[in-house]
Amino acid sequence: MTLVGNFSPLVLVGDSDRVEAETVGAYLDGWAGHDKVRLATANAIKAILSGAGRLVGRIARGYLPGDPGKLVGVNSDQDQQKSIDVGSHNLFVELLIAAGVASILSEEADLPVAGKADGLVAVAIDPLDGSGNVGLGAPLGTIFSIFPADVEEPFLQPGNRQIAAGYVSYGNSVDLGFSVGEGVIFATLDPVSGQFHITRRNVKLPERTSDLAFNASVQRHLSAGMQAYVNDAFLGKDGPRGRNFNMRWLGAAVGDMHRIMQRGGLFFYVNDSRPGYEKGRLRLVYEANPIAFLAREAGGKATDGSRPILDIVPQTYHERSALVFGVAEEVDILGEYFVK
């Protein structure tokens, strides 16, 4: 019996045989116009989307060609690198250099990679967020931030100088969330055409949420104020918060970001008492910054517990930061506990 073959795709009731939604490429062309910095930004985003389309093809093949999770080295912070980490880094760097960017800062390289000498934008990127989930069917993603390259150290600028930011989520569909400073846009990759088509515009977070995303196994290591926040939430409608909360934790910042951008919620990964976690764990430049940019564009907030992420001036390329993001009201409430 043939289990798979060259069959036509499944068509559901209500499906259209033609995707007519605007492509991200067309949107970016219209946004950029003749502005040189905008054109450079658009070209960088297009390069990332091209890489995402190629990367998802390898992710989908799993272990068939070889082990994508094979350990092949360590990065600047001595985190173990998998084969797919290095491969995705090389892929995006190659495409971004071809797109004319000035420099690329990747989680997988100690120093920025030089690009075009007169390039107008610099790209900070985590080529494959959540690579610990490789082979498990759990979320993976690519997250990026684009800065003007008009200063000597473009990656040591505060996040409020970002021109654009976004992420690609590799799940049961390949979804893009991005902003060029004019609201958050969602798009989905059509595997037939190879194009990302826009599905939602001006995405906004709700005013209130009862969904929390954090690693509950480290609660005992949190500060007294943060433990009080968690305990009060877990008391539900019988506690001081007066309502029940749900908990979600996907183990990849892009996965949690994508869910929160669609359904609302609050994510936190803050500093705690464990060695190596004193300043938080996520990287400020290419994880916290793009998330904070998107949260702001969607009407939410992002802080390190007390300070707006977008106001923090990085001191090093791979600086770590605590991160709290999501629905603005809940970010503010957590902030009151954080400083206790």
From Swiss-Prot:
<keyword id="KW-0460">Magnesium</keyword>
<keyword id="KW-0119">Carbohydrate metabolism</keyword>
<dbReference type="GO" id="GO:0006094">
    <property type="term" value="P:gluconeogenesis"/>
</dbReference>
<comment type="similarity">
    <text>Belongs to the FBPase class 1 family.</text>
</comment>
<feature type="binding site">
    <location>
        <position position="128"/>
    </location>
    <ligand>
        <name>Mg(2+) 1</name>
    </ligand>
</feature>
<dbReference type="InterPro" id="IPR033391">
    <property type="entry name" value="FBPase_N"/>
</dbReference>
<protein>
    <recommendedName>
        <fullName>Fructose-1,6-bisphosphatase class 1</fullName>
        <ecNumber>3.1.3.11</ecNumber>
    </recommendedName>
</protein>
<dbReference type="GO" id="GO:0006000">
    <property type="term" value="P:fructose metabolic process"/>
</dbReference>
<dbReference type="GO" id="GO:0000287">
    <property type="term" value="F:magnesium ion binding"/>
</dbReference>
<keyword id="KW-0963">Cytoplasm</keyword>
<feature type="binding site">
    <location>
        <position position="107"/>
    </location>
    <ligand>
        <name>Mg(2+) 1</name>
    </ligand>
</feature>
<feature type="binding site">
    <location>
        <position position="215"/>
    </location>
    <ligand>
        <name>substrate</name>
    </ligand>
</feature>
<dbReference type="InterPro" id="IPR020548">
    <property type="entry name" value="Fructose_bisphosphatase_AS"/>
</dbReference>
<feature type="binding site">
    <location>
        <position position="126"/>
    </location>
    <ligand>
        <name>Mg(2+) 2</name>
    </ligand>
</feature>
<dbReference type="InterPro" id="IPR000146">
    <property type="entry name" value="FBPase_class-1"/>
</dbReference>
<dbReference type="GO" id="GO:0005829">
    <property type="term" value="C:cytosol"/>
</dbReference>
<dbReference type="InterPro" id="IPR044015">
    <property type="entry name" value="FBPase_C_dom"/>
</dbReference>
<dbReference type="GO" id="GO:0042132">
    <property type="term" value="F:fructose 1,6-bisphosphate 1-phosphatase activity"/>
</dbReference>
<dbReference type="Pfam" id="PF00316">
    <property type="entry name" value="FBPase"/>
</dbReference>
<dbReference type="GO" id="GO:0005986">
    <property type="term" value="P:sucrose biosynthetic process"/>
</dbReference>
<feature type="binding site">
    <location>
        <position position="287"/>
    </location>
    <ligand>
        <name>Mg(2+) 2</name>
    </ligand>
</feature>
<dbReference type="Pfam" id="PF18913">
    <property type="entry name" value="FBPase_C"/>
</dbReference>
<comment type="pathway">
    <text>Carbohydrate biosynthesis; gluconeogenesis.</text>
</comment>
<feature type="binding site">
    <location>
        <position position="126"/>
    </location>
    <ligand>
        <name>Mg(2+) 1</name>
    </ligand>
</feature>
<comment type="subunit">
    <text>Homotetramer.</text>
</comment>
<dbReference type="GO" id="GO:0030388">
    <property type="term" value="P:fructose 1,6-bisphosphate metabolic process"/>
</dbReference>
<dbReference type="GO" id="GO:0006002">
    <property type="term" value="P:fructose 6-phosphate metabolic process"/>
</dbReference>
<keyword id="KW-0479">Metal-binding</keyword>
<dbReference type="InterPro" id="IPR028343">
    <property type="entry name" value="FBPtase"/>
</dbReference>
<keyword id="KW-0378">Hydrolase</keyword>
<feature type="binding site">
    <location>
        <position position="129"/>
    </location>
    <ligand>
        <name>Mg(2+) 2</name>
    </ligand>
</feature>
